[in-house]
Amino acid sequence: MLNVLLRRKAFCLVTKKGMATATTAAATHTPRLKTFKVYRWNPDEPSAKPHLQSYQVDLNDCGPMVLDALLKIKDEQDSTLTFRRSCREGICGSCAMNIGGRNTLACICKIDQNESKQLKIYPLPHMFIVKDLVPDLTNFYQQYKSIQPYLQRSSFPKDGTEVLQSIEDRKKLDGLYECILCACCSTSCPSYWWNQEQYLGPAVLMQAYRWLIDSRDQATKTRKAMLNNSMSLYRCHTIMNCTRTCPKGLNPGLAIAEIKKSLAFA
């Protein structure tokens, strides 16, 4: 008789525990829907104006980054949504876009967990658009090519060894070589918006400075001459949007100031 009573009590405890677990699981899976308003424009429909399209994503079933939400939308709701992405870890710069009013990388931009706040996503500002969130970076890369971003020397070691660099000279490149050319800084700059055909912009100028101070490079005079005109460099008015928005925490504004200083005392 005692064994029967103990078994009944144990069964009741297990049943209550199971019900509590089920209740907790149900609460956990209560949808947490957040609205993402995404810029849409299709070049195949030139008469249609650009617009914001709303999508709802359950934050319980989505990764923590904005790129996770965009991928989920594309995979499950709208396969026509177009954007660039690759590494998903802030290295390649492909997923640069304007999120919540700020240029950044979608793969390292965390989603605000407040479901009541809508999140607006646009392509990088003041650029020609290929489709949806994809900007045309042709001019940006042409400008980068124009500064000749590679080591230039008139002579090399005769024995075929590498061109060595001291630890101190190598440290001068810190904060410059890490640039991933995502264009977040350049497309946040009003001067670049005004004339991106002639003003090189923060990203390209920072790379120009990177080669100007590389102790192994022997084209310093040529590089300075290329920049010493009224448009390529001096359209920078130290607005500093570039430094504030850089997703890698770099300081293009400082690099531009250093170029100006080097030209002033050349």
UniProtKB/Swiss-Prot annotation:
Its cofactor is [2Fe-2S] cluster; [3Fe-4S] cluster; [4Fe-4S] cluster. Residues 1-20 form a transit peptide. Changing K260T: Abolishes SDH activity. No effect on complex assembly and stability. One of its GO terms (cellular component) is mitochondrion. It is found in: Mitochondrion inner membrane. GO terms for molecular function: 2 iron, 2 sulfur cluster binding; 3 iron, 4 sulfur cluster binding; 4 iron, 4 sulfur cluster binding; electron transfer activity; metal ion binding; succinate dehydrogenase (quinone) activity. Residues 169-199 form the 4Fe-4S ferredoxin-type domain. [3Fe-4S] cluster binds at C189, C236, C242. Keywords: 2Fe-2S, 3Fe-4S, 4Fe-4S, Electron transport, Iron, Iron-sulfur, Membrane, Metal-binding, Mitochondrion, Mitochondrion inner membrane, Oxidoreductase, Transit peptide, Transport, Tricarboxylic acid cycle. [2Fe-2S] cluster binds at C87, C92, C95, C107. It catalyses: a quinone + succinate = fumarate + a quinol. It comes from the Eukaryota. This is Succinate dehydrogenase [ubiquinone] iron-sulfur subunit, mitochondrial. It comes from Saccharomyces cerevisiae (strain ATCC 204508 / S288c) (Baker's yeast).
